[in-house]
Curated annotation (Swiss-Prot):
Its biological purpose: Involved in peptide bond synthesis. Stimulates efficient translation and peptide-bond synthesis on native or reconstituted 70S ribosomes in vitro. Probably functions indirectly by altering the affinity of the ribosome for aminoacyl-tRNA, thus increasing their reactivity as acceptors for peptidyl transferase.
CDD domains: S1_EF-P_repeat_1, S1_EF-P_repeat_2
BP terms from Gene Ontology: peptide biosynthetic process
Family: Belongs to the elongation factor P family.
Keywords: Cytoplasm, Elongation factor, Protein biosynthesis
Entry protein name: Elongation factor P
Cellular location(s): Cytoplasm
One GO cellular component term: cytoplasm
Pathway noted in the entry: Protein biosynthesis; polypeptide chain elongation
The species this protein was found in: Chlorobaculum parvum (strain DSM 263 / NCIMB 8327)
GO MF annotation terms: translation elongation factor activity
Pfam family, any one: Elong-fact-P_C
Length: 188
């Protein structure tokens, strides 16, 4: 157990019996009240975001983690099958561990898997950006190209992304896996 004041952003703690990742931690001292830490956390089992106010002296249980590189192989029902690139062992990863970024996973992509000290999977981190081919989008007319609007496009993984009007079917685009937003077009 350590004091909340010694915990930083990105740490994984056990809070109310479940693992949580600290997304942000801000120290506040309002007027003549006692200091506290305002924490924004992500429950790693359910994927839900939680806000909590810790007292400045509160103790939390920090989980010791191990990070390993894995390669995505294929989907098996609700699970994603990943392979350890060193030992070639395969593991099944539940979709909830990957979160909303699962819609951008394509074959052979490398991911970081964070394991707890008991061997359970806490989270799966995809690369920040992925390059995917647009498989379906409405063709842009001459009038559309002059304006700065967006249109929906389906990429090779089946995800829908809003793209600029000049993007056509067959274009390769870069997508931010954290937000699901179009970043730019990849030149070949």
């Amino acid at each position: 157990m350590v004091s909340i004041s010694n915990v930083s952003k990105g740490a994984i703690i056990r809070w109310k019996g479940e693992p949580h990742s600290i997304e942000s931690l801000v120290h506040r001292t309002p007027g003549n009240l006692r200091a506290f830490y305002q924490a924004s956390m992500k429950n790693l089992k359910t994927g839900r975001n939680v806000e909590y106010r810790f007292s400045a002296t509160e103790q939390v249980d920090v989980i010791v983690t191990e990070r390993k590189k894995y390669q995505y192989l294929y989907r098996d029902g609700e699970d994603y099958v990943m392979m350890d690139t060193e030992t070639f062992d395969q593991i099944n990863v539940p979709e909830v561990a990957i979160g909303s970024a699962s819609r951008f996973i394509k074959d052979a992509v490398m991911v970081d898997i964070v394991f707890a000290d008991d061997g359970s999977i806490l989270e799966v981190e995809l690369p920040t950006f992925v390059e995917l081919e647009v498989t379906e989008t409405n063709p842009a007319s001459k009038d559309d190209r002059a304006t700065s609007g967006t249109k929906p496009a389906i990429v090779e993984t089946g995800a829908e992304v809003n793209v600029p009007m000049f993007i056509q079917t067959g274009s390769i685009i870069r997508i931010d896996t954290r937000s699901g937003e179009y970043m730019d077009r990849v030149k070949k």
